[in-house]
Amino acid sequence: MSFNNKTIEELHNLLVSKEISATELTQATIDDIKAREEAVNAFVTVAEEAALAQAEAIDEKGIDADNLLSGIPFAVKDNISTDGILTTAASKMLYNYEPIFDATAVANAKAKDMIVIGKTNMDEFAMGGSGETSYYGATKNAWDHSKVPGGSSSGSAAAVASGQVRLSLGSDTGGSIRQPAAFNGIVGLKPTYGTVSRFGLIAFGSSLDQIGTFSQTVKENAQLLNVIASEDAKDSTSAPVRIADFTSKIGQDIKGMKIALPKEYLGEGIDPEVKETILDAAKHFEKLGATVEEVSLPHSKYGVAVYYIIASSEASSNLQRFDGIRYGFRAEDAKNLDDIYVNTRSQGFGDEVKRRIMLGTFSLSSGYYDAYYKKAGQVRTLIIQDFEKVFADYDLILGPTAPSVAFDLDTLNHDPVAMYLADLLTIPVNLAGLPGISIPAGFAQGLPVGLQLIGPKYSEETIYQAAAAFEATTDYHKQQPVIFGGDN
């Protein structure tokens, strides 16, 4: 029996009334994963034994009636550490790495009796926008298996969209939650930088990385964020949680809300059908009582260039720790210490990871630092200032999540620049440390279109308010791919 069409609140009521047990729900989730996994390849590891053991322990002590997520299974992106469960970052380099600790976000969820069901596939070390750079093979889009699911949190998005799990965690460095959420027609939130601890997240770009949430609905997304958000002494960049309940404004109307629509977000390079869908969504917000006005974010056009200098520079530093000495893969054909380093990194990293390490090393090198890295930091400040000017007069920014719908597998992965441009609309949010959400807003060419809502720092409850108002008066979130029902 499958429970994948039940809401979290419905599942909670079933668990509290003992109509089902946490063990039965966990086994049903494992069955849902197995029934769909061959088609979508969303998981690197299904932690069947550990999940069932955790569920049995929860059943033994009893479901907490006051804890909505008690006994609920969830999936975790494979770059987020899980105690005793393989955490590979979808790389040969960490093919056998089993952490002895949980990331703070995972520990927070487990403390609320949530059950880790498995680790989801992703672009290697979170470097990619299509889900195709994984050592474990490409994840497929839940709606059309010939299309990419987006990246880098490809498996976390596809798992929710295909009905394998109801909730999952991902990470977002330049759009890695919002873009796959858009491509798969689900809800994905990147919180304000520092809202969720990065302790236990395998680092890519430390000034950009943020753990976030995937779900079927806006309210469930906020409910999961309530659990994982926390200040953490183990992460010096974490911030006090300023919102007691991220669901607090859900259900409130948005009359009088001022929403900005940047002209740059609907300009050159945006698919005409995507543009039309977003303009229709803007009109819908106006019908709900909001004011939508065109604004300009003039420096957003430099976002991709700035991001790939800063993120690659940080990655080249962060990935120095993977050397074949301490953990993970080690090349066997080494004659000396230098050979171990060179051969291990040459054989252990995929092409995209190597490309970004080389780009970052070049940007930080003597003679080029001022021209590239320093200049990128200065332009990053201009991008931040653009947002600050808009948010002085507006509550939120609206636009498409991605320039297009999901594209064909094995097309852009041979053209790095074209692939990088797919993150054009999400990258500025990371550069500024802002919260952003993608919600389903319609379809183009039979594939989901994502609407992105961006707010000032620590405005997640307002973002959820507007997103929920849109969701409550449309039915895009109710439409599911064929595979969700088990047929393929």
Swiss-Prot record:
It comes from the Bacteria. Pfam families: Amidase (PF01425). GO terms for biological process: translation. Keywords: ATP-binding, Ligase, Nucleotide-binding, Protein biosynthesis. The active site is at residues 77, 152, 176. PROSITE patterns: AMIDASES. One of its GO terms (molecular function) is ATP binding. SUPFAM superfamilies: Amidase signature (AS) enzymes. InterPro entries: Amidase, Amidase_CS, Amidase_dom, AS_sf, GatA. Disulfide bonds: none annotated. One of its GO terms (cellular component) is glutamyl-tRNA(Gln) amidotransferase complex. Allows the formation of correctly charged Gln-tRNA(Gln) through the transamidation of misacylated Glu-tRNA(Gln) in organisms which lack glutaminyl-tRNA synthetase. The reaction takes place in the presence of glutamine and ATP through an activated gamma-phospho-Glu-tRNA(Gln). Heterotrimer of A, B and C subunits. Belongs to the amidase family. GatA subfamily. This is Glutamyl-tRNA(Gln) amidotransferase subunit A.
